[in-house]
Amino acid sequence: MSFSDSESSSHGGGGGDYKFFRQISRDRLLHEMLGSTKTGDSKAWKILIMDRVTVKVMSQSCKMADITDQGISLVEELFKRREPMPGMDAIYFIQPSKENIVMFLSDMSGREPLYRKAFIFFSSTIPKELVNHIKSDSSVLPRIGALREMNMEYFPIDNQGFLTDHEQALETLYAEDAENSRHFHICLNIMATRIATVFASLKELPFVRYRAAKSTASRDLVPSKLAAAIWDCISKYKAIPNFPQTETCELLIVDRSVDQIAPIIHEWTYDAMCHDLLDMEGNKHVIEVPSKTGGPPEKKEIVLEDHDPVWLELRHTHIADASERLHEKMTNFASKNKAAQMRSRDGSELSTRDLQKIVQALPQYGEQVDKLSTHVELAGKINRIIRDTGLRDLGQLEQDLVFGDAGAKDVINFLRTNQDTNPENKLRLLMIYATVYPEKFEGDKGVKLMQLARLSPVDMKVISNMQLIAGSPENKAKSGSFSLKFDAGKTKQANRKDRSGEEETWQLFRFYPMIEELLEKLVKGDLSKSDYLCMNQSSHKEESEARTGSVRKSSAPTAVPERKATPHSMRSRRTATWARPHSSDDGYSSDSVLKSASTEFKKLGQRIFVFIIGGATRSELRVCHKLTSSLRREVVLGSTSFDDPPQYITKLKLLSEKDIQGAPAQPFKPQYW
């Protein structure tokens, strides 16, 4: 029996291609865990047993085919009834909880164990008393092939993103009287443990920075409490073999108070539009396609995943740009077919739908055409929704508010002339308005606005609940009035400034989430040390190295390039046209995204991690991908959950509903089940 932690490094080693966060996680599960159990008889099949948490970890990193390739013939859940298989070995990937240990001992003790031998891997640090509990059973000890801490209790949801799976973090930590609930501290402790396993798994020791509290309110102290808990966990990992003793990366901990607009504004990228406007379940969507037999339309499930090169290329592009590129791809395919050339002899341009029908008839391009047709369907559906709901005008007003180009008259005029606008869209507009112009919601002003928008009292509560995240109000609202104060010291009515040096190629593409600005300041050393404190203050040299990423081998520049500011009007870049042709490469234009991804990032500086308490957005994930290219440092986004606007609004509603505290989260559906 061995009791140890994995000893491999996460930095890609030996001059090979750089390995991103999710790839490292996948490799550790498949090779360090499953692969390490192979004995002389490498062809012998094994059983993999997991609990409700570790099955999520596995399903977010690996496909069932990957697991089978490692010699796993059966995957089972720890607490479900299982058939005895005394002739086979079992691999346990479980949390180090008392309940799990009791169940494991029940499986392997006595004269007739369920399995021949057990290899046990824990998702996080196992307490000594539980180790002693295992060792105390003399019948089990000879049947244990390995006993290790994998330190993987996070859920990779992207090549550069992970979750702690705390869907209810917002209401558990920020709701009314949240600090008086026992769930408050339980949530923070589990969250800290899971975040810490990220650094244990990657063998990284971070500078832990966090948003400083502006008051003594418990909800305002959440980032500092989480930072302290994470640092306490990470400090204990220094005993792990090969774990760094000095800082190797950056961790920035913030909550939704730093940016309450990103979760609700209409983001115009293909990825964000799919999840905002379509009926998505996770990364899946069902569409109707023509029947191949001539019958009624058939339902087809679409999965948007990293294995799809078209999705990887288009996901972070503007929806209009994505639509143009899809049309170009269809045209290229159609040009290979004589029927297409004949149909276009009259000089008329073929529509994307016509091109789709033509390329579907090309058998030699079956899989590529299928992927392409899928995205044509999705983009077409999104564009129809944009047109039918008048979303362009609403999106323009939203961004004008954020950048200080619109005010009360514009909002009132929009609400008066667009009474049939979707109630949720009107609510999102007023939430943005309240963030930029909080004084417009003081007294009965907010009530009148909500009445003009024909929104319900429940919707009014959503806006007032934003204050619970922003901080405690100085004065309680008088009975029957509506009050909101996000920033009493605000003088300039703009929530964002146009970024100098960045040309707006597409209309409605001005908006950027605040973490982009925060991370750039962090790298340049300009992040306010009073607003963002550090748990582990070190020497100036070490801190400078962490900012520039000089410890990890990299010849590429790691700081943010200086931008030459040019005078411009915020309104001067607008156009009456829906979209303009792109004039420069935006970083997503290659048709060989999968191939170039591995070669482009052979050398990167030190990693930067940013963790957002209360849910992250598609735009924030996009920024992490963008900054990885511009900073030449992998930026990894972590959060308690990944929320689309409707989900976030629902969570805001629950902040004032006391009966939801401690309610069970939505069931998780593994991707390979």
From Swiss-Prot:
**Name of the gene encoding the protein in the UniProt record:** SEC1A
Indicate the family of this protein.
Belongs to the STXBP/unc-18/SEC1 family.
Query: Would I find Protein transport among this entry's keywords?
Result: yes
Q: Give the span(s) annotated as Disordered.
A: 538-591
The organism's lineage is: Eukaryota, Viridiplantae, Streptophyta, Embryophyta, Tracheophyta
Protein name according to UniProt: Protein transport Sec1a
Q: Which Cys pairs are S-S linked?
A: none
Spell out the PANTHER family in the cross-references.
VESICLE PROTEIN SORTING-ASSOCIATED
Write down the Pfam families for this protein, in alphabetical order. Answer: Sec1 (PF00995)
> What task does this protein carry out?
Involved in the vesicle trafficking. Binds syntaxins.
Q: Which UniProt keywords apply?
A: Protein transport, Transport
**Record's subunit section:** Does not bind the syntaxin KNOLLE.
**GO BP terms:** protein transport; vesicle-mediated transport
The question of whether Protein transport is a record keyword is answered with: yes
From what superkingdom does this record's organism come?
Eukaryota
